[in-house]
Amino acid sequence: MPGNNSAKGTATGNATALWRNAQLATLNPAMDGIGAVENAVIAVRNGRIAFAGPESDLPDDLSTADETTDCGGRWITPALIDCHTHLVFGGNRAMEFEMRLNGATYEEIAKAGGGIVSSVRDTRALSDEVLVAQALPRLDTLLSEGVSTIEIKSGYGLDIETELKMLRVARRLETLRPVRIVTSYLAAHATPADYKGRNADYITDVVLPGLEKAHAEGLADAVDGFCEGIAFSVKEIDRVFAAAQQRGLPVKLHAEQLSNLGGAELAASYNALSADHLEYLDETGAKALAKAGTVAVLLPGAFYALREKQLPPVQALRDAGAEIALATDCNPGTSPLTSLLLTMNMGATLFRMTVEECLTATTRNAAKALGLLAETGTLEAGKSADFAIWDIERPAELVYRIGFNPLHARIFKGQKVSP
């Protein structure tokens, strides 16, 4: 294989576990393509990768282990990463889905009590325990497809206590399943009815004090916002981001989904982890993201569910050198999707992304979009031993198949956790 096709550890002592007789898609950026390695082995020591590369290059001090698994020639990829979800919410919006199919407009749905108002009402009303119980099946579905890291946003409270409740529930989920959960504070998601037409007051009274509390309680790993005509302006989001920056919290942004307000450029000016959606992103915005190292997170589930016509400018992002990630955008209204494998197929089919781009988008680039690239997202020495073993003949099957899950095993922090 061309390039550096191994990752050697520096620590001494036997490996904790060996996965032998495998084929690797390392996603190592120092290698060509997906970083494929044949006749490969992964050595794990104390939950971290000590070596990932050709069996012939395995150091002697790692050649024996407490446990050895013969992978039978199967493919191993980094564990998948869903870097944009709204996984915690109350109720569901199946009724408005039926209304939309029958021709109801957004306004008619809203008047009937649907839309985000419905999710806010249900999320406010439910206890932590019920929200956990409702979120677990969604979480389990993602984990069953080889996902080991998931971002979860608040944003269906729109008052301080419910926003914090959602973040606490997300933290609770991490204690109930073998998964890494990253939280984003998204009070700047919409304006509640009692602040209609008073965005500035809502930010002053709710968003900023809630951010302070979320930070003080260690509930927020990042701060998000929705920059759009139906949500918040660039100037309004700038206030939120300035407060996040003062507290040392990274930012990310829903931007350019329905129009181009310049949200991506705002995100880039803060060196945001990511800017997400981006259907109406222009060339200037794409270049700004690339220059800032801000990942462009595309969300084909929302594009599909909303029957959008405006495609995100994938070629402009490529030309600018921006890194692209894909995510489910799991939410009750516009993307009730809990399959990252299907998301990859949508990225390829709807957005014309390549197999290599789709695999990179749900591993390495998704890790970067969460600020976790030093920890996970590739099969390299020193990183957490998070990987997925697949019953496939070639990695393209993960993108090509629809409604099929070929996961053989999921390894999280060096432990086999499913199925």
Curated annotation (Swiss-Prot):
GO terms for biological process: L-histidine catabolic process to glutamate and formamide; L-histidine catabolic process to glutamate and formate. Pathway: Amino-acid degradation; L-histidine degradation into L-glutamate; N-formimidoyl-L-glutamate from L-histidine: step 3/3. One of its GO terms (cellular component) is cytoplasm. Its main location: cytoplasm. It is an enzyme of class 3 (hydrolase). Its EC number is 3.5.2.7. Zn(2+) binds at H84, H86, H254, D329. Signal peptide: none annotated. Its cofactor is Zn(2+); Fe(3+). Fe(3+) binds at H84, H86, H254, D329. N-formimidoyl-L-glutamate binds at Y156, N331, G333. It comes from the Bacteria. Belongs to the metallo-dependent hydrolases superfamily. HutI family. Monomer. Forms a tightly packed homodimer in the crystal, but this seems to be an artifact of crystallization. This is Imidazolonepropionase. It comes from Agrobacterium fabrum (strain C58 / ATCC 33970). The lineage of its organism: Bacteria, Pseudomonadati, Pseudomonadota, Alphaproteobacteria, Hyphomicrobiales. The gene is hutI.
